[in-house]
């Protein structure tokens, strides 16, 4: 058990540090500190020895040089059970430092400001802090090292239970956390500096890219049972990584992927919306004046494919909707909240996974999207674009009616979340046929028609969305034969005139958005 007699505390994040230091003092721990931390502790009555007084060497260079001294680093690095180390410590008057509590200058927060200058960024690169942290973490067998205020309580509790000591397993865990922290810190610095162009302005993508993820949980298996898998969080907050599982079996790899796609889709809509997702694709999507109606129509969009799917809603789940969900075979349901009267209804299906996710409009993704390929990593911005009706260009002789425009806006939002080549048919806030993942656009158009007819939907007067341009008129002809009267697509084909002519021949209103929404999974 590592007994603690001397601690060095130097933090930029002062949450809880005064109470932590006061409790250490109650254990008889001698406390060393620096600069602003020392002032904060002394102002609250904690007895502190300034590092400069301890080393006999003052702070220099406007505080840049404070702790880089043999009396500090020797006290952190010396092995307590090595006689040559203890002999040298005695010879040079270097007492052991048993606990180090340090967090670093706020570099990431500083560069997050759009008007951050290079000088400001460089001044917020911590030198002494990482050096001490690495020294203490390397010598974890003799030193307890803390970099996170959230760990103060656990260390104090262990000291209470162990007469002022901290166990080896805790020291090792905290040391591991330190190396992850300093790696992330140095990675942020490298990312920032390598993103600066010759003019000093930041480019979108840095020359070197350092990423860090923390394991949220092991998964039973991956996409298939023979694949091992785990789920990692990136620390940005939000998304399924921060959702609360209220009941049901453990999440699977496929649950997480489908759940992410499902929630992202429904959060595109301001009105109550529900969707059912299977294998990364929406089976049915609907909006309505209330959640129950939206769910009923989403399920009806393709009840065959929806069997065993993932349901997401963008409103708190009520009892009526929960009753309907519990009568159908669903793997998982996600909503911003589960209302109290809905909980016992869902609980009857003990294996049903139920998750509450953070709402706001905060689901919109920030940062970058990654795709691993052999030998490298593809990086892009998330597709956050969604073109408003004011951005549309009517290219047909006939403009869409008010209702057709509503239908076009609806299917266009859905189409963004369907695997390419994607065609979505819909009317009055409900999908009635989806052609997903086809190698040709005309096949996607025909698949959507076939699905609609199989389910008994009448496509006369329906709207169609295509995630990319029509390379030939055949897709328009197929949709027209089914009765479609309004089409929304990006445009941009060398045969746009031929495609527009087809729309005009069939009396179809066609609009171009100018933006493509490929989705390749």
Curated annotation (Swiss-Prot):
Recorded catalytic activity of this chain's protein: (6R)-10-formyltetrahydrofolate + 5-amino-1-(5-phospho-beta-D-ribosyl)imidazole-4-carboxamide = 5-formamido-1-(5-phospho-D-ribosyl)imidazole-4-carboxamide + (6S)-5,6,7,8-tetrahydrofolate; IMP + H2O = 5-formamido-1-(5-phospho-D-ribosyl)imidazole-4-carboxamide
PROSITE patterns in the cross-refs: MGS
UniProt key word Oxidoreductase: no
Top-level taxon of the source organism: Bacteria
GO CC entries: cytosol
Keyword Iron set for record: no
GO molecular function: IMP cyclohydrolase activity; phosphoribosylaminoimidazolecarboxamide formyltransferase activity
CDD domains: IMPCH
Pathway: Purine metabolism; IMP biosynthesis via de novo pathway; 5-formamido-1-(5-phospho-D-ribosyl)imidazole-4-carboxamide from 5-amino-1-(5-phospho-D-ribosyl)imidazole-4-carboxamide (10-formyl THF route): step 1/1; Purine metabolism; IMP biosynthesis via de novo pathway; IMP from 5-formamido-1-(5-phospho-D-ribosyl)imidazole-4-carboxamide: step 1/1
Any single GO BP term: 'de novo' IMP biosynthetic process
HAMAP family assigned to the protein according to its UniProt record, in alphabetical order: PurH
Family of this protein: Belongs to the PurH family.
Protein name: Bifunctional purine biosynthesis protein PurH
């Amino acid at each position: 058990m590592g007994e603690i007699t001397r601690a060095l505390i130097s933090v930029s994040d002062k949450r809880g540090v005064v109470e932590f230091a006061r409790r250490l003092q109650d254990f008889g721990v001698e406390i060393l500190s620096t600069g602003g931390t020392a002032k904060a502790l002394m102002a609250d009555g904690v007895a502190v020895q300034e590092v400069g007084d301890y080393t006999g060497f003052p702070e220099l260079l406007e505080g840049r040089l404070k702790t880089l001294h043999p009396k500090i680093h020797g006290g952190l690095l010396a092995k307590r059970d090595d006689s040559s180390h203890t002999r040298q410590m005695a010879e040079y008057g270097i007492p052991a430092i048993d606990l180090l509590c340090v967090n670093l200058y706020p570099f990431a927060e500083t560069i997050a400001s759009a008007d951050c200058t290079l000088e400001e960024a460089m001044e917020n690169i911590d030198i002494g802090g990482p050096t001490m942290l690495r020294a203490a973490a390397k010598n974890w067998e003799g030193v307890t090292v803390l970099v996170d205020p959230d760990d103060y309580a656990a260390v104090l509790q262990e000291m209470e239970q162990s007469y002022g000591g901290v166990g080896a397993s805790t020291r090792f865990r905290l040391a591991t956390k330190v190396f992850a922290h300093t790696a992330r810190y140095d990675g942020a610095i490298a990312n920032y500096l390598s993103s600066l162009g010759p003019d000093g302005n930041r480019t979108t993508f840095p020359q070197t890219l350092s990423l860090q993820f923390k394991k949220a949980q092991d998964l039973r298996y991956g996409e298939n049972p023979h694949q091992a898998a785990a789920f990692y969080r990136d620390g940005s907050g939000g998304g399924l990584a921060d959702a609360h599982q209220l009941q049901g079996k453990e999440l699977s790899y496929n649950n997480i992927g489908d759940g992410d796609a499902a929630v992202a889709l429904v959060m595109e809509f301001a009105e109550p919306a529900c969707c059912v997702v299977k294998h990364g694709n929406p089976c049915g999507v609907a909006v309505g004046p209330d959640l129950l109606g939206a769910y009923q129509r989403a399920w009806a969009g393709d009840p065959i494919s929806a069997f065993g799917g993932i349901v997401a809603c963008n409103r708190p789940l009520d009892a009526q909707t929960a009753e309907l969900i519990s009568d159908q075979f669903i793997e998982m349901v996600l909503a911003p909240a589960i209302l109290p009267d809905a909980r016992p209804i869902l609980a009857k299906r003990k294996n049903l996974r139920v998750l509450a996710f953070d709402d706001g409009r905060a689901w919109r993704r920030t940062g970058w999207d990654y795709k691993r390929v052999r030998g490298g990593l593809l990086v892009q911005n998330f597709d956050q674009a969604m073109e408003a009706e004011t951005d549309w260009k009517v290219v047909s002789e006939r403009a869409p009616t008010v209702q057709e425009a509503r239908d076009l806006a609806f299917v266009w939002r859905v189409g963004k979340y369907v695997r390419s080549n994607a065609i979505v048919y819909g009317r009055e806030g409900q999908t009635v046929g989806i052609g997903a993942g086809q190698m040709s656009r005309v096949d996607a158009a025909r698949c959507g028609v076939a699905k609609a007819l199989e389910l008994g939907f009448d496509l006369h007067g329906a709207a169609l969305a295509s995630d990319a341009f029509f390379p030939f008129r055949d897709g328009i002809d197929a949709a027209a034969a089914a009765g479609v009267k309004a089409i929304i697509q990006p445009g941009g084909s060398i045969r746009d005139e031929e495609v527009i002519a087809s729309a005009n021949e069939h009396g179809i209103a066609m609009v171009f958005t100018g933006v493509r929404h490929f989705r390749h999974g």
